[in-house]
Swiss-Prot record:
GO biological process, one term: queuosine biosynthetic process
Cofactor: Zn(2+)
One term of GO molecular function: zinc ion binding
Alphabetized HAMAP family for the sequence: QueC
NCBIfam families: 7-cyano-7-deazaguanine synthase QueC
Residues bound to ATP: 10-20
Organism: Bacillus licheniformis (strain ATCC 14580 / DSM 13 / JCM 2505 / CCUG 7422 / NBRC 12200 / NCIMB 9375 / NCTC 10341 / NRRL NRS-1264 / Gibson 46)
Pathway(s) annotated for this protein in UniProt: Purine metabolism; 7-cyano-7-deazaguanine biosynthesis
Keyword field contains ATP-binding: yes
Any Pfam family: QueC
Name of the protein described by the UniProt record: 7-cyano-7-deazaguanine synthase
Amino acid sequence: MKQEKAIVVFSGGQDSTTCLLWALRQFQEVEAVTFQYNQRHKQEIEVAKKIAAKLGVKHHLLDMELLNQLAPNALTRDDIEIEAKEGELPSTFVPGRNLVFLSFASILAYQVGARHIITGVCETDFSGYPDCRDEFVKSCNVTVNLAMERPFVIHTPLMWLNKAETWELADELDALDFVKNETLTCYNGIIADGCGECPACKLRANGYNEYMKMKKERA
């Protein structure tokens, strides 16, 4: 474990919760930051608070509702249908979201004396989101370091993992059931296994089933 401090960009979902658990194994002191941007499922905020409290992690909540004004999308507006047309970005894409989140997480890290920033973005299952790519994160890391003259390190533990491998990581962290039962991934705001119909639920369920099949075959 590094005797250093880390900030985790945290939504209360499967990926960011796995990252939070990973960070708790890696760093001496860990804090989490959640962004309120009028997301479609308001339960996300409450779930994030609950998980942070259960894990004994200091939790910051930042108001980012300006994103909803600048970038109307299916994650923030009930009147926009969740869909993904071939050759187009999904309607859940929020332009600049991860750029803004990582920038503000870096500002918070500066203020609390943290060097490490952890985000759960993933290029393997990135659904076409350009701000989930490894090259974007590396570019952002260089930018915030130049902007604040700090040697921040942005970590992406899930970058090259598919959903089955993300479940495997949760299991390696002795938290498979915790992540399965306590997190909120569903676009319709249903905790744990979710609605089973939205793209996020299907991706999550398929990954879980694939991992459990792999685990059984290894036994």
